[in-house]
Amino acid sequence: MSPEEYVRVWPDSGDLGGTELTLALPGTPTNASEGPKKFGNKRRFLETVDLKLGEAHENNYISSMVTNDQLVGWPPVATARKTVRRKYVKVALDGAAYLRKVDLGMYDCYGQLFTALENMFQGIITICRVTELERKGEFVATYEDKDGDLMLVGDVPWMMFVESCKRMRLMKTGDAIGL
């Protein structure tokens, strides 16, 4: 047998469009007049610059702003969390193996904060307030400010305390004598 006998000629051998691999979805008509699309080519400078000047350009800008405002899930969740005025600080109790969190934004004054702390550690402690001349309480409330200094709760005005407090510590009265 000669090699020509093994070669078959298909009836539509001139048109290989049916077997051509493309990136189009199956059943999508392809336009042969467009030719193969080239991806990955660099654009020329004039193709990147929008030369629409004047009012038509402003209208396109305004319409694009409207569509951005209608996006689902906008603004991002992280941005929305920043706008919420929450000021959580950790409260450590000397001798306890656990910490608690307190939202300072819920309270308007030191009295409310001390009441909440006593209720939080109910039956365990009594907190001495700075205004008391005799330190009758078992614990003294201290806090660490932005600079890392340990200060007594009640030494500064309430709003300044809320802004500067990083964490709170309920110290035994004997340990807080030098503060």
Swiss-Prot record:
PROSITE patterns: PB1. Signal peptide: none annotated. Induction: By auxin. GO terms for biological process: auxin-activated signaling pathway; regulation of DNA-templated transcription; response to auxin. Gene3D superfamilies: Phosphatidylinositol 3-kinase Catalytic Subunit, Chain A, domain 1. Its main location: nucleus. Residues 86-173 form the PB1 domain. Keywords: Auxin signaling pathway, Nucleus, Repressor, Transcription, Transcription regulation. GO terms for cellular component: nucleus. One of its GO terms (molecular function) is DNA-binding transcription factor activity. It is found in: Nucleus. It holds the Pfam family AUX_IAA. A motif (EAR-like (transcriptional repression)) lies at residues 21-25. Aux/IAA proteins are short-lived transcriptional factors that function as repressors of early auxin response genes at low auxin concentrations. Repression is thought to result from the interaction with auxin response factors (ARFs), proteins that bind to the auxin-responsive promoter element (AuxRE). Formation of heterodimers with ARF proteins may alter their ability to modulate early auxin response genes expression. Belongs to the Aux/IAA family. Homodimers and heterodimers. The N-terminal half of the protein contains two conserved domains I and II. Domain I includes a slightly degenerated ERF-associated amphiphilic repression (EAR) motif which seems to be involved in the activity of transcriptional repression. Domain II is required for the correct degradation of the protein through the SCF-mediated ubiquitin-proteasome pathway. Interactions between Aux/IAA proteins and auxin response factors (ARFs) occur through their C-terminal dimerization domains III and IV. This is Auxin-responsive protein IAA15.
